[in-house]
Amino acid sequence: MGAGQSICFPPISGPHHIGCTDVMEGHSLEGSLFRLFYPCEASETCEQPLWIPRYEYCVGLADYLQYNKRWVGLLFNVGIGSCRLPVSWNGPFKTKESGYPLIILSHGLGGFRVSYSAFCMELASRGFVVAAIEHRDQSAAATYFCKQTSQESSPTESLEEEWIPFRRIKEGEKEFHVRNPQVHQRAKECVRVLQILQDASAGKPVINVFPGGLDLMTLKGSIDMSRVAVMGHSFGGATAILALTQEAQFRCAIALDAWMFPLEHDFYPKARGPVFFINVEKFQTVESVNLMKKICAQHEQSRIVTVLGAVHRSQTDFAFVTGNMIGKLFSSGTRGTLDPYEGQEVMVRAMLAFLQKHLDLKEDYDQWNSFIEGIGPSLIQGAPHYLSSL
């Protein structure tokens, strides 16, 4: 993997083989880009996709972390640019008459559509279809869309990439005035992807800008649109909470270490539930926990748990990057005292129990119902005591 760097994803525990494809819908900023993880048919020969799709994302990641874009972007590309996901790229979709439940996933600040592949793969192996969005509000480390430059050429010949850089807060700017419009755009993008997949499940044609990908018509009748959840990490956690309120088709939300700051105070009386807040030990503040408690007070099925020994980036794929050089570039914020593989297992089990309960799934995930109450390995209910004062 170049310079001894690699990423070692947690082993998959579900019964399904996993397929993966990228979908870009539309030729403008208002379109959508997401990576779809899904149960697929077994295949003797399958291509495994790159974890980091392109070099531009390595450069964007370096820029987001405020390193030299040229040199550190190159280092990231050498260190992790050749790592691949253990899934079948554009693998044949495994149809299901009763349909799979759907999860829309929103990334955090500086993330992009592959930043939570470990969670996505595990959930897909358990029989979920997961759409990991790449937001176009300038909160992604890098993203792009393909615009048509000529009406006379064929659609693929006339496409030109337009890259959208990460938006940093400028001197003198109020951060809330930047982040609040972003979180609202992000929620709309979640709803847009939901609509695209609803069309695909209904057998309506969805044109994917990327050539040679999965035929989305194969999804027809195989997504259960009555069992849909929205999920996100950090900025994506706030996005999931807002999207749940704005779109009734979302039945519940999972907020991983949610960054509550971008949500306006007027939002809270309107907030819907249930929301499952899965926090880590060292990120939240008393103020943010109190905002979570406001939502929980309005919706008795909402819960807050904390994963002890975990840090903010423990909930991203970067927790599984090995090698000292790349690890140091991500700083001590990449790993906590809790083994990242143990943390992943605990969080996934808590998610599955919550999803079974609120999507009415007929699985055995209720064996982990105690995790929803903060009773389980490395879990506590609510927040650590030093954040618990109202």
Curated annotation (Swiss-Prot):
PROSITE patterns named in the record: LIPASE_SER (PS00120)
Name of one Pfam family that matches: PAF-AH_p_II
Compartment list: Microsome membrane; Mitochondrion membrane; Cytoplasm; Endoplasmic reticulum membrane
Tissue expression as described in the entry: Expressed in kidney.
Reactions mediated catalytically: a 1-O-alkyl-2-acetyl-sn-glycero-3-phosphocholine + H2O = a 1-O-alkyl-sn-glycero-3-phosphocholine + acetate + H(+); a 1-O-alkyl-2-acyl-sn-glycero-3-phosphocholine + H2O = a 1-O-alkyl-sn-glycero-3-phosphocholine + a fatty acid + H(+); 1-O-hexadecyl-2-acetyl-sn-glycero-3-phosphocholine + H2O = 1-O-hexadecyl-sn-glycero-3-phosphocholine + acetate + H(+); 1-O-hexadecyl-2-acetyl-sn-glycero-3-phosphocholine + a 1-O-(1Z-alkenyl)-sn-glycero-3-phosphoethanolamine = 1-O-(1Z-alkenyl)-2-acetyl-sn-glycero-3-phosphoethanolamine + 1-O-hexadecyl-sn-glycero-3-phosphocholine
Principal localisation: membrane
Residues with lipid group (N-myristoyl glycine): G2
Keyword Nucleus: no
EC number: 3.1.1.47, 2.3.1.149
GO cellular component terms listed in the entry, alphabetical order: cytoplasm; endoplasmic reticulum membrane; mitochondrial membrane
MF (Gene Ontology): 1-alkyl-2-acetylglycerophosphocholine esterase activity; platelet-activating factor acetyltransferase activity
One BP annotation, GO: lipid catabolic process
Active site: S234, D257, H312
Keywords attached to this entry: Cytoplasm, Endoplasmic reticulum, Hydrolase, Lipid degradation, Lipid metabolism, Lipoprotein, Membrane, Microsome, Mitochondrion, Myristate, Transferase
Membrane topology: Lipid-anchor
Family: Belongs to the serine esterase family.
Its job: Catalyzes the hydrolyze of the acetyl group at the sn-2 position of platelet-activating factor (PAF) and its analogs, leading to their inactivation. Hydrolyzes propionyl and butyroyl moieties approximately half as effectively as PAF. Also catalyzes transacetylation of the acetyl group from platelet-activating factor (PAF) to lysoplasmalogen and to sphingosine, producing plasmalogen analogs of PAF and N-acetylsphingosine (C2-ceramide) respectively. Has a marked selectivity for phospholipids with short acyl chains at the sn-2 position.
Subunit structure of this chain's protein: Monomer.
Protein's name in the database: Platelet-activating factor acetylhydrolase 2, cytoplasmic
Organism per entry: Rattus norvegicus (Rat)
